[in-house]
Amino acid sequence: MSETAPAETATPAPVEKSPAKKKATKKAAGAGAAKRKATGPPVSELITKAVAASKERNGLSLAALKKALAAGGYDVEKNNSRIKLGLKSLVSKGTLVQTKGTGASGSFKLNKKAASGEAKPKAKKAGAAKAKKPAGATPKKAKKAAGAKKAVKKTPKKAKKPAAAGVKKVAKSPKKAKAAAKPKKATKSPAKPKAVKPKAAKPKAAKPKAAKPKAAKAKKAAAKKK
């Protein structure tokens, strides 16, 4: 009898990560670290706020500055070098004035001139932004005014119709005036009786003529008596 050897099970080879995936994971890790760093405000802003909040006449010392930053939740021990660099950069820019010591180991005070100069441009920008908003709002008012003008233009059409009706009524009124003028013909009729009166007076003038025969008869009677 021939013996059959058991078949060897093939073990899967370990899958190597592609270099593209490694780069992607590194980028993601770097982005996460950058986000963590960017979440908090920069050191320069924290330093300026701490110095501005101090009421010391001679300025805020480095030790007092570190205490103020630590009270605000900033890790002073890890970021000691950053604090020193931030102080030097702010002094070079003119934001802070060094009243004592040299370098980062001294007392620092806020430069009022620089602070006022920074505040003025911000105020100008805010004023310009406010001025732009009304400029954008004016066209709406102009549109409303234009709509009102259109409404005013439409109204005269309605006003014209009553005017035309008034003209028609005025045109009809002369007919009534003509009807009122007809009674003038009736006034002419009294003139006819005036012409008739002289005709009636003629018989009165004829009566004396009738008296003449009486006189003749009287003369004849007188002659007979003789």
Swiss-Prot record:
Record-listed N-acetylserine modification sites: S2
SUPFAM superfamilies, A to Z: Winged helix' DNA-binding domain
Compartments (UniProt record): Nucleus; Chromosome
UniProt modified residues of type N6-(beta-hydroxybutyryl)lysine: K37, K55, K67, K88, K93, K109
Chain positions found as N6-methyllysine: K27
Residues modified as N6-succinyllysine: K37
Domain of life of the organism encoding this protein: Eukaryota
Gene Ontology annotations for the cellular component aspect, listed alphabetically: chromatin; chromosome; euchromatin; heterochromatin; nucleolus; nucleoplasm; nucleosome; nucleus
Post-translational modification: H1 histones are progressively phosphorylated during the cell cycle, becoming maximally phosphorylated during late G2 phase and M phase, and being dephosphorylated sharply thereafter. Phosphorylated at Thr-11 by GSK3B during mitosis in prometaphase and dephosphorylated in telophase.
Biased amino acid composition, Basic residues: 122-133, 140-161, 169-187, 194-226
Function in brief: Histone H1 protein binds to linker DNA between nucleosomes forming the macromolecular structure known as the chromatin fiber. Histones H1 are necessary for the condensation of nucleosome chains into higher-order structured fibers. Also acts as a regulator of individual gene transcription through chromatin remodeling, nucleosome spacing and DNA methylation.
Protein name: Histone H1.5
